[in-house]
From Swiss-Prot:
Protein's name according to its UniProt entry: Periviscerokinin-2
Source species of the chain: Mantis religiosa
Compartments, as annotated in UniProt: Secreted
Function summary: Mediates visceral muscle contractile activity (myotropic activity).
A Pfam entry, by short name: Periviscerokin
GO biological processes: neuropeptide signaling pathway
Keywords linked to the UniProt accession: Amidation, Neuropeptide, Secreted
Additional record remark: According to PubMed:19808072, a longer form of this peptide exists.
Length: 11
């Protein structure tokens, strides 16, 4: 849940 990280905001 590292919201903000692209392109995987769910990582």
């Amino acid at each position: 849940g590292a919201s903000g990280l692209i392109p995987f905001p769910r990582l």
